[in-house]
Amino acid sequence: MDYKETLLLPETNFPMRGNLPQNEPQRLKSWYEERKVYEKMKKNRQNAVKNFNIHDGPPYANGHLHIGHALNKILKDIITKTHYFYGENVRYVPGWDCHGLPIEQQVEVKLGDKKKELSKVEIRELCRQHAREFIDIQRDEFKTLGIIGDFENPYMTMKFEFEADIYKALCEIAKKGLLVERSKPVYWSWAARSALAEAEVEYEEKEDYSIYVAFELDGDALEKLGVKEASAVIWTTTPWTLPANQAISLKPDEIYVLTAENLIFAKPLLESVVQSGLSKGEIKKEFKSSLLENTHAINPLNGRKSKFLLGDHVMMDGGTGLVHTAPGHGEDDYYVCLKYGFSEILMPVDDGGCYDESIKHHGLFRSDVVDEFVGMHIFKANEKILELLGKSLLSVSKFRHSYPFCWRTHKPVIYRATKQWFIAMDESKLGGKTLRQTALKELEKVKFYPSVGIKRIGSMIENRPDWCISRQRDWGVPIAFFRDKATKEVIFDSEILDHIAGIFKEKGADAWWALSIDELLPKGSKYKAENLEKVMDILDVWFDSGSTWHAVLQSDNYDAGKYPASMYLEGSDQHRGWFQSSLLVSTAINSHAPYESILTHGFTVDAKGEKMSKSKGNVIAPQDVAKTHGVEILRLWVGMSDYSSDLKISEDILKQISEQYRKIRNTIRFLLANVNDLESLNTEFNILDKWILARAKKVFDEASACFKNYDFSKGFNILLNFLSADLSGVYLDVCKDRLYCDAKDAPRRRSAQSAMAIITKTLLPLIAPTLTYTVDEVMDYAPKIIKGEAKDAFDLVYEPIKFDLSFEDELLFASREKFNEIVDVLKKDKKIKSTLELSLETTNHNITSYDEREVADLYMVSSVRAYDDSEPLAEFELEGDKFKIIASNLHKCPRCWKFNASKEDALCPRCEEVISAK
C-alpha cells in the first residue's frame, strides 16, 4: 500500500519563488490604482491615539534617482510603516525642490545663444517644464520602491500657492527685524555668477601659491619704531587679493620683533620663519603690537597705504603673525576694518571673477600695467602679480590644501563683498533672544538618531555667520520687495507684502517679472509706482526647503500631519543643510524647532567603501536592482544595514541579501503550508511548542524594541537568527512527524499548528514595514486562522505574543547538539543512514519525565527511554548525566519511517491507530 496518500502533507499556493521583478509592478499598481492603500491606511487609523509624520526633505527635481535617493526614501517608508503597523495614525507627503541653479543651468545648456532672446518669464517657464518632467519621472521611480504616501498631492516648491507661502515666510522674518541688507564678503561662485550659502560649499583639494611679501613701513610707523628702515612681512595664499589690500592685522597684546634684515615678524613665529629661510633670527628690536596700531605700511604692488590694525582673528599657528587684510575678500578682514571705521571697502572683482574698471579708479595697479588687468580672471592674474612684486616677494612656493568649491559648478569659489540679504543670527529680536540663542535652545528639545547629531548641528549653529539668502539668478522665489528710488529704503509695508503674496498665489512668482510695479501695488496704495524700484534678487533654495514646514505642515493645502513634525530624516550632510535651514526659518518665525526628532543616515558606497562614480564603474542603480533582484531585496538591504555609518552595496552584497530573503520567504511558506487546515487555536501546548513560543516571544519583543528605536539592522539580525537557528533549524524540522503522520485533529498536531499560526500572525506585521510587497502577497494565500478579518497587509496591526509561556531545559538542547555531532560521524562511517534508526537512553530524569514522543521528535529518533544495559553505537556524558545511542530493536514503519513497528512491513501503533480511524 502507498501510505503517502494517508499523510497530511503541507499544502499552500504561496509560491516558493517570489519572481519579484515580474510581480512587484502588478502589486504596486493595485496599491495605487485599485486599493488606494494610502487612503486606506489613513481610514484604518482615524481613531488612533498616537500620530506620526515624517516631513519629507525634498529631493531636487532634476535627473533620475540614484541609490542614495532609494536608501533615503525606503528608510522613511520603513519608519512610517513601522509606526503604522504599531497602530498609529501616520502621514507622509512627498515633496520636490524645484527652484535653483542646476535646473537653470540645464535649461541654459539647451538654449545656448537663444537665451539672450528670451525674457526672464520665458526662461522661468522652461525651468518649470524641466522640473515638472523630472518630478513625473521620479514620482514613478519612488513609487516603484514600494513607497506609500500622498503621491496624488505631493508638495512642489514651484506650485503657485507654495511660492506664495515661501514669500510669506520671508515677510514674517522681515517683519521681525531679522532680515538685513548689507555689503559683506560672502562665498561667491564666479562660475555660477551668484552668492552661495555655507551649505552650498564643498571642500576639495586645490593647488595654490604660498607667498611672503614685504610691505615697507611708512613714515609714521618708522617714527613709532624709531628706525629708518623696516618692512612688515605678510603671508598669503591669494596673490590676486593683494591689489585690494587695505590693512595689515596684528595680534593684540602680542610681542613682535624687528630682525637684523629689517623685517618684522611675531616673536612666537620667529623660529618657523628662520626655518623657512626668511631670516637668520637675529633680533634688533622687540615691541608690542599696539605700538604700530593706526600707523601705515606701503603696498609694494600699487604704492597705496595699508593701515596696521589689531584683530583677534590673528593666530600664532602659522605665517608671520602679520595678516594681509583685504576687507572686500574676507569675512575676518571685513569685520576688523568695520571696527576701525573704514568708510570704503575695495572689491575690484566682477560677477565672473575678473578685475573690473575700479582697479583704475582706485589705483590698485601701477598706471603703466593697469589696463592689462582689466577683464583678466583673478586666478590668471596670480603669476603676473608675482612678477610685479619684484624684490618685495621674499618667498614663493606652491602647496595643496582643502579649499571651498561651488557644489554645483565644482569650481573654486572666492570671497567677494557684495550687497546681499541676510537673516541676522545675533540680533535680539525674539523676545530679547537672538536667533542663534533660540535655535540652540530649541535643539536641546530634539531627539537625535544617532545621538551625536546634536553636537554636530549645535556646533554649526554656534559658529555659523549670518545666513546669506539672496542669489543673483532667475529661477527661484523673488525677494519681492520695493525700494524707494530716492532714499534706497526698502518698503516693508504689510498691505503691500500681503497683496504681493496674494498675486503669487494666483499667478505664481513669475508675476514679479511679468507685471509692472503699478500692477503689483494694491489699489489706493500711498506709494507711487514711479518712486519705486524692484529688488531683483531671488531666494537661496535652502530658504525654499527650509520653509517647507510653513507651506506644508501649517497649510490647508496638504494633509501632512502635525507641526512640529515627528521626524526629519535625511543624510548626515543635512546637518549643515536642510536641518539647519528649517530650524532657522522655524525659530525665526515661531521660536520653535520644526521637528521633534532628527534621524540621519550615511552615504552609499561600494563593497570597498569607495564613493560610487561612473568612471569607476561601481554604480549600483536602483532601477537595475529592481529589474534583476526585485525592490524587496533593496528594501531588505536597507533594513539589514547599519544606516548610522556609510552603507556598502554591490552585486555580491545584493546576492547575500537575496539569500536571506529566500530563507524568510521559504520559512513563511512552510508555516502557511502547515496551518492550512487549522480553524482555531489551541491554548494547551506541548513542551516543544512552549519552548518555541517562549523563544519567539523573547525574540519578537527584542526585535520590536529595536524597530521602535529605529535600530532595524539589529532587529533583523535577531529575527533572522531566530528564523534560521531556532525555528527552521530545530522546531519546524522536529515537528514534521506529528504534522504529517498524526491524526488531523490530534492534540499534538493541533498544538504545533497553533504555535506556528501564532508565530506567523506575529511575524507578518513585524516585517511588513520592510517587506511590504511580500507580506501583502502572503495575505493573498494566508488561511483565515492567520489573517482573521484582514483583507491585505494594510489591515494588520502588530500585537506581541500574549501567552506567558516558559520552557527552559539547557541540558535537553545541549544534549541534542552533542547527539547531532556524534550522529554526523556515524553517518560518515556509514553505520546508520537516518537518526530514525536510533533510540536514545539517558540517566537524566527530567528528560525521561517528558512526553516520550516529544523528546523523541526533538532528537529525531524513534524513542527515548531510561538508561539500561543496551549495547551502544556511541555514548557521551553531559553535566554528570549519561547518554547512550543505540540501534533500535524494532522495525521501520512504512508510513512514518520510525523504527517503532513490532515486525517487518507492519505499521507502528500510532500509524495503525490513524489508519484505522479513517
Curated annotation (Swiss-Prot):
Q: Which reaction does it catalyse?
A: tRNA(Ile) + L-isoleucine + ATP = L-isoleucyl-tRNA(Ile) + AMP + diphosphate
Q: Which family does it belong to?
A: Belongs to the class-I aminoacyl-tRNA synthetase family. IleS type 1 subfamily.
Does Metal-binding count among this protein's keywords?
yes
Q: What does this protein do?
A: Catalyzes the attachment of isoleucine to tRNA(Ile). As IleRS can inadvertently accommodate and process structurally similar amino acids such as valine, to avoid such errors it has two additional distinct tRNA(Ile)-dependent editing activities. One activity is designated as 'pretransfer' editing and involves the hydrolysis of activated Val-AMP. The other activity is designated 'posttransfer' editing and involves deacylation of mischarged Val-tRNA(Ile).
Q: Which NCBIfam families match?
A: ileS (TIGR00392)
Which annotated residues bind ATP? 614
Q: Where in the cell does this protein reside?
A: Cytoplasm
Q: Which residue ranges does the UniProt annotation give for the motif 'KMSKS' region? A: 611-615
Protein name stated in the entry: Isoleucine--tRNA ligase
Write down the Gene3D superfamilies for this protein, in alphabetical order. 1.10.730.20, HUPs (3.40.50.620), Ile-tRNA synthetase CP2 domain-like (1.10.10.830), Valyl/Leucyl/Isoleucyl-tRNA synthetase, editing domain (3.90.740.10)
For the motif 'HIGH' region, what are the positions?
59-69
Protein species of origin: Campylobacter concisus (strain 13826)
Task: State which Enzyme Commission number(s) the record gives.
Answer: 6.1.1.5
Cellular component terms (Gene Ontology) = cytosol
Q: What is its main location?
A: cytoplasm
Note what the entry says on domains: IleRS has two distinct active sites: one for aminoacylation and one for editing. The misactivated valine is translocated from the active site to the editing site, which sterically excludes the correctly activated isoleucine. The single editing site contains two valyl binding pockets, one specific for each substrate (Val-AMP or Val-tRNA(Ile)).
Which residues are listed for Zn(2+) binding in this entry? 893, 896, 908, 911
Record note on cofactor? Binds 1 zinc ion per subunit.
Enumerate the UniProt keywords alphabetically. Aminoacyl-tRNA synthetase, ATP-binding, Cytoplasm, Ligase, Metal-binding, Nucleotide-binding, Protein biosynthesis, Zinc
